[in-house]
Curated annotation (Swiss-Prot):
This is Peptidyl-tRNA hydrolase. PANTHER family: PEPTIDYL-TRNA HYDROLASE. The active site is at H20. Belongs to the PTH family. The record marks N10 as: Discriminates between blocked and unblocked aminoacyl-tRNA. Monomer. The keyword Ribonucleoprotein does not apply. It catalyses: an N-acyl-L-alpha-aminoacyl-tRNA + H2O = an N-acyl-L-amino acid + a tRNA + H(+). Hydrolyzes ribosome-free peptidyl-tRNAs (with 1 or more amino acids incorporated), which drop off the ribosome during protein synthesis, or as a result of ribosome stalling. Catalyzes the release of premature peptidyl moieties from peptidyl-tRNA molecules trapped in stalled 50S ribosomal subunits, and thus maintains levels of free tRNAs and 50S ribosomes. The gene is pth. Keywords: Cytoplasm, Hydrolase, RNA-binding, tRNA-binding. It comes from the Bacteria. The record marks D93 as: Stabilizes the basic form of H active site to accept a proton. GO terms for molecular function: peptidyl-tRNA hydrolase activity; tRNA binding.
Length: 189
């Protein structure tokens, strides 16, 4: 069995600290905590790090396809490793949630998120585990694109840092317990 934890974002230093890259930030924190290193895999169009936890292989993935094509990398890896959809978790930003709010779900629509739209289109289902991190709505007069491509202010950065620690703990808990329902009960809120 293989589990796959995917963080959504855009590759390149230009996007590194943007709100839309919260999934990449989460994966970076998780692999740092678990002392896992990434390799660039051109075949899968992703950066991949893997380790074994409880005798199961766990792949940590940052698609390098850019957000709107994330489903290409996710589908390729699910197919190659024959990963059951219940063993997939996708971490991403949600602008309909307050900054730093954490929400775990086992299914749902894309909610306007193009990375999630791409994954749903490529894997053919909305029923996969996700961890959403709130980035808040744009300020009055600001476009959504400018908001998601902007960086967090100092105050929000502190809150997001604490939330990313909770994401690390949620993923580690899930990998130990092998129970996303139990993980949702413990970490939602």
């Amino acid at each position: 069995m293989v589990k796959m934890i995917v963080g959504l974002g855009n590759p390149g230093s230009k996007y590194e600290k943007t709100k839309h890259n919260i999934g990449f930030m989460a994966i970076d924190n998780i692999v740092k905590n678990l002392d896992v290193t990434f390799t660039d895999d051109k075949n899968f169009k992703a950066q991949i790090g893997s380790t074994f936890i409880n005798h199961e292989k766990v792949c940590f993935v940052k698609p390098t396809t850019f957000m709107n094509n994330s489903g290409i990398a996710v589908k390729a890896l699910l197919t190659y490793y024959n990963i059951d959809i219940t063993d997939l978790i996708v971490i991403y930003d949600d602008l309909d949630m307050e900054v730093s709010k954490l929400r775990l779900r086992s299914k749902g629509s894309a909610g306007g998120h193009n990375g999630i739209k791409s994954i749903i289109a490529h894997i053919g289902t909305q029923e996969f585990n996700r961890i959403k991190v709130g980035i808040g709505r744009p300020l009055k007069g600001m476009t959504v694109i400018n908001h998601v491509m902007g960086q967090f202010n100092t105050e929000d950065n502190i809150a997001i840092s604490l939330t990313l620690d909770r994401v690390v703990n949620a993923v580690k808990f899930y990998l130990q317990e092998n129970d996303f329902e139990k993980t949702m009960q413990k970490f939602n809120g």
